Structure formats: C-alpha cells, structure tokens
C-alpha cells in the first residue's frame, strides 16, 4: 500500500532573491526526495510558501518606497519563478498572507495561553527615538560587555564569541541610522519553552535527525528558556486582545506549513483534504531546512504542536544542511559574491546545475560551489561518463540499423553478471535516496554509467558486427539499453529532464510516457519496471544530452 508523505521546505523569506546556497540547502534536496518517493508510488504532497512577516520586511519595504503587501508580493513571485526555473516540483507554493493563516495562528496561540504555556511579561527593550520603533537584535550594535569590542552585534560578539541580550550592550546604537538607543518598557507574550523540555526530548528521541545535529538539538532543548512571541510592529498577524502587538515571525511562520496545506486543499476544491496529511498519524512528514533554522524546527515548532489539543502531525525526519559557500565565501549580493541565476541558466543547462549542486550538497559539513569544479564535473562526469555512454550506444545502434531490441532468449554469463550489477547499483541508489544523500546518489549514477561504458567496451560490438555475429550484437545492445533505462531511473530525481530524454530515445515497452507527467513521474521504481525479461526497446534518433563547458 502506498505511503502518504508530506514534504516541506523552509519557507523562503520574502525579502530578497534566492541564491545557490538556499537551493542546495533546503529546496533541491526536498525536490529530489519528492521525485524519488513519487517514483516509488507513494502519495506525495510537497508544500512550501513565502514567509511574509517580520521587521526586516518592514524596513526594506520602507527603504524602497513600497507598501508591505506590495513588497512581499513582489518577492513571492520572484521565489515562485525561481522554483519553476529550477524544476522544483512543488505541489503548491503558498504564502503566510494566505486566507487560512491568521485564524490557525490565533488558534495555536490561544490554546497555548489557555494551558498556561504563554504568559505576558513586562521587560525593557532597546528603542530608537529617531526611528520611533523597537529594534530587533540584528539591527543593534554596540560595545561588547565581555571584551569591550566596539561594533559587537546585538546578540553575539563576533570577536570574543560571547552571547548576551541586546540590552547588555554598552552604548547600544541603531545599525540603520547610527542613533543611540534607549531602554523602554514594553509588554510581550512569552512562550514558556522550558516547561516543554521533557516532552520535546521524548519526541526528538523518536525522530530521525542527521547524527551531526542530534547533539546540538538535544543540548538546545535542555537549555530552553521563555521566549517572546510578540513584537511591537504594525506589519504582522495581530495578537488577540493585545493591542499594538503582532506575532513574532518565527511563531507564525512554521504554522505556515499547515495553512499552506489548507490553501492547497482549497485550490483542488477539496477543503478538508489537508486533514489527511496533518491529522493522520500514519502520514510520514519530512522537513528540509538550512542550518540556521534548526532551533525553530527541532524545538520551537514541535513545542507549539505538543501544546495543542488537536493532534497535528509532527515531523518524522528533519533534514538539515550545513552552509553552502561560493568560492569559499558566503553568498552576498551586497559584497558582489553571488551568481545571477537567470544569467547562469541562460548559459548552462538546468540539469548541469542540479547535478553539481547535488554532488556538492552541504549534507554534513560546509561545502562550496566553484566555477572550476562546475566545469570539471560537467565535462568529466556528465559529458565524459554519463553522456558518452548514452550517445555511443544509441549512435552505434542507429548507424547499424538496430531499432527494435528484445530480450535475447540466451544471455551469456557475462551479460547476466552485468545485468545483476546494474540492479545492485539501483538498490544502492534507492538506499541513498531513502537516507536523503544526494552526494551518494550522484556517485551511484556515475558508477552505473561507468559500468555501462566498461561493458560496452569489453564486448566491442563493432568487432562482432564485422565478424558477422549480428545476433550477439543485438544482445549486447539490449543489455546496454537496459542499463540506460535504469540509469535514467536512478538519475531522474536529480536529472529529470535528462532522464526523460533517455526514456524517449529508448521508448521501453515497460514505460507509457504518454500517461506520465514529465515533472511528476510516478510508480516506476518497482520490480515490474526493473525486470528485463519482457522488455522491448523501440529506439529513436539519439540526441546529444550534454555539451562541453568551456
């Protein structure tokens, strides 16, 4: 019976364009996994949406002279266009200004408050008289209270590494205007996360976390403290019965996964369908996020869910990436260290980019994108191994008039060993995808392509054809094409366009392309498709898959 799988990627903040680091961290891995689970025949729902509230949005919208809604709508469209260009196969891309979001955020808050998990508290916060607003930590700097470094950030000193409250800074000032800040009394609602430590630890023990983050998550949960979940802003979801307050963006944003699913259900005219994914314990829920979002997804959002009477689905697996750099430095448009994604895709094919991002994904440690590595991988792996294997086999078949290939009645031992090895690599690739490893999946793809090349070289059908062994040549071509069919299968999650082209050129009897959606190929990774005994290939004119990168 197919499994029901809910997949979410961290909501991109509607405050700027996405770069390769974002894509390699939270979006390509989720897309690859969604495509893989669809191939297995599972009922997959891949959801995402724009995160549209927060002080950074208000400040930047004001700076460029746009209204808040106009500003976030602009970047919502930018993000949607980016995902479309990159082949991110989202089933729905919503936003936190969707018509369902406000009500469910209020419900979460009121439930937590009714259970005594949210209480109001008066505190002193840094306020800018010039800008007439309270400033979040990221917009504050001053002198470190520990080492005396002037220019320390609002929450951490980048010189000595000390962390502190922004109110502990000496001579705090606004990073926006440079004006001195004053302490001003304000009241906020605080979520008593420290009261959720035990249920959170019990929950995390059962969830799948990559080993390199588990200790961090457990330590973080053990040290939870009350956290303000309201802000003094005009842009945000108003807090019930709390005038002039809105919810902190990291309180409302994760709830966006649920409201986005409600939005999707409404879009397909089945308003209650969201419940199949969020209110059924049998659903498998996998989250994909970046490193800096771990605390909110591993502790804060689960705590919010655990505090509800409604049994919302909690994640079964949290897949977090490390940082992805560009030529050894962080992506930064302001500092000129960025890649124009549109210009890049105008120059290079999409699958080249997807492959290199997958092969260098920051799965367990920081990694980087370099143009030299991009060129090397494209030319050596995609052109030299993968593309060469496909092209040489199909070009040879066309040149010599082999169009219809059926499974030979008698396979030689070396053929059977080759076919067994092909199936072994498919099983390995399935294990790699199941464990969320794009890097290892890329290795399996290249291993299978290399295996096919070696087999074709060793059998040397061009020699056999000259010697009059046409039936033997046909058997070799069948085995090579079978390998290519499986190569397209294991490559599809990462190289969907390329896999589709291969299947079109092979036209295998086992695949009805007319009844498949190119972007959502389903129910192929099974014994029927992998079996070769009844296979027939109706070869078409081969097309070059990859070109050299200069």
UniProtKB/Swiss-Prot annotation:
Cross-referenced CDD domains: Anticodon_Ia_Met, MetRS_core
Co-factor note (free text): Binds 1 zinc ion per subunit.
Signal peptide: none
Residues annotated to bind ATP: 333
Chain span(s) of sequence motif 'KMSKS' region: 330-334
Keywords: Aminoacyl-tRNA synthetase, ATP-binding, Cytoplasm, Ligase, Metal-binding, Nucleotide-binding, Protein biosynthesis, Zinc
Main location per the UniProt record: cytoplasm
Molecular-function GO term, any one: metal ion binding
Gene Ontology CC: one annotated term: cytosol
Entry binding sites for Zn(2+): 144, 147, 157, 160
GO BP of this protein: methionyl-tRNA aminoacylation
Pfam families named among the record's database cross-references: Anticodon_3, tRNA-synt_1g
EC number: 6.1.1.10
Cofactor: Zn(2+)
Motif ('HIGH' region): 12-22
Reaction(s) this enzyme catalyzes, per UniProt: tRNA(Met) + L-methionine + ATP = L-methionyl-tRNA(Met) + AMP + diphosphate
Location in the cell: Cytoplasm
Family: Belongs to the class-I aminoacyl-tRNA synthetase family. MetG type 1 subfamily.
Free-text function comment from the UniProt entry: Is required not only for elongation of protein synthesis but also for the initiation of all mRNA translation through initiator tRNA(fMet) aminoacylation.
Subunit note: Monomer.
Record protein name field: Methionine--tRNA ligase
Organism per entry: Chlamydia caviae (strain ATCC VR-813 / DSM 19441 / 03DC25 / GPIC)
């Amino acid at each position: 019976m197919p499994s029901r799988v809910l997949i979410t990627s961290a909501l991109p903040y509607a405050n700027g364009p996405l770069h390769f680091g974002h894509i390699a961290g939270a979006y390509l891995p989720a897309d690859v996994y969604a495509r893989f689970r669809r191939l297995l025949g599972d009922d997959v729902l891949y959801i995402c949406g724009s995160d549209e509230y927060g002080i950074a949005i208000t400040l930047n919208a004001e700076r460029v002279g746009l209204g808040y809604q106009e500003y976030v709508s602009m970047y919502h469209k930018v993000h949607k266009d980016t995902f479309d260009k990159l082949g991110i196969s989202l089933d729905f891309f919503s936003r936190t200004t969707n018509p369902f979001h406000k009500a469910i955020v209020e419900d979460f808050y009121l439930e937590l408050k009714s259970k005594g998990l949210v209480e109001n508290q008066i505190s002193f916060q840094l306020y800018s008289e010039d800008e007439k607003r309270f400033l979040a930590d990221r917009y504050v700097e001053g002198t470190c209270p520990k080492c005396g470094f002037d220019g320390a950030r609002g929450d951490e000193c980048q010189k000595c590494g000390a962390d502190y409250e922004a109110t502990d800074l000496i001579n705090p000032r606004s990073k926006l205007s440079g004006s001195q800040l004053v302490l001003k009394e304000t009241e906020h609602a605080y979520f008593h996360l420290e009261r959720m430590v035990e249920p959170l630890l019990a929950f995390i023990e059962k969830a799948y976390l990559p080993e390199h983050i588990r200790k961090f998550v457990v330590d973080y949960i053990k040290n939870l403290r009350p956290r303000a979940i309201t802000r003094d802003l005009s842009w945000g979801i108003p807090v019930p019965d709390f005038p002039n307050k809105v919810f902190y963006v990291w309180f409302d944003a994760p709830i966006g996964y649920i409201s986005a699913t409600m939005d999707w259900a409404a879009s397909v005219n089945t308003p209650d369908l969201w419940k199949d994914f969020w209110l059924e314990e049998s659903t498998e829920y996998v989250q994909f996020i970046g490193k800096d979002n771990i605390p909110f997804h591993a502790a804060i959002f689960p705590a919010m869910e655990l505090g509800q009477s409604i049994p919302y689905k909690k994640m079964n697996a949290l897949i977090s990436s490390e940082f992805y750099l560009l030529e050894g430095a962080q992506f930064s448009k302001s500092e000129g260290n960025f890649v124009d994604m549109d210009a890049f895709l105008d120059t290079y094919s999409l699958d080249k980019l997807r492959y290199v991002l997958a092969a260098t994904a920051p799965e367990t440690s920081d990694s980087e994108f370099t143009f030299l590595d991009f060129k090397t991988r494209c030319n050596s792996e995609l052109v030299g191994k993968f593309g060469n294997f496909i092209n040489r086999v199909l070009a040879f078949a066309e040149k010599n008039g082999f169009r219809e290939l059926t499974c030979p009645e008698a396979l030689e031992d070396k053929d059977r060993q080759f076919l067994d090895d092909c199936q072994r690599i498919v099983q390995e690739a399935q294990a790699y995808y199941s464990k969320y490893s794009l890097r290892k999946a890329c290795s399996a793809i290249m291993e299978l392509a290399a295996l096919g090349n070696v087999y074709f070289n060793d059998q040397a059908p061009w020699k056999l054809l000259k010697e009059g062994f046409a039936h033997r040549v046909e058997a070799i071509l069948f085995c090579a094409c079978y390998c290519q069919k499986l190569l397209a299968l294991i490559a599809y999650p990462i190289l969907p366009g390329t896999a589709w082209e291969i299947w079109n050129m092979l036209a295998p009897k086992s695949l009805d392309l007319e009844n498949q959606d190119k972007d959502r190929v389903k129910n192929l990774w099974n014994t029927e498709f992998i079996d070769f005994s009844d296979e027939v290939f109706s070869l078409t004119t081969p097309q070059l898959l990859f070109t050299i990168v200069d």
